[in-house]
């Protein structure tokens, strides 16, 4: 029996793609609160592995990636919890890409299969994101993939996460942040 408090993949996709890019990548406290109110139980179920059956289809895998990779960045902005499901999202993304689920969907949906690679602090994952973006994305997707990869090449991690994750910034990282750094 399905838990009525949990969203379906279609509800996740309708909400996310109905909001559009102007909401996805900018700070909006009301949008963050709406995600938290509507999707927190769904996120918690996904993070506990209870929604793994969503991976059976391209649309389901996409919805699971949004729940694991995008929603926490909104729901838990400024907290270590924003990144808590990144490893799980990356595992889902790798499996979905191996099944060519990304190529079954058009842009911008396709790009969300690549963001868990882009959010990884592992250079191999970053290089895979650049490769996937060059093959299957648009110029904007490639630009952001390359920017993220360059930061990991330079620092081995994302300096803009240091304060939230309780990490001490190196002098080079602090200079980068002081110069405007990267807040994405």
Give the positions of each predicted feature.
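Intrinsically disordered, low-complexity activation-like regions
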Residues: 1-184
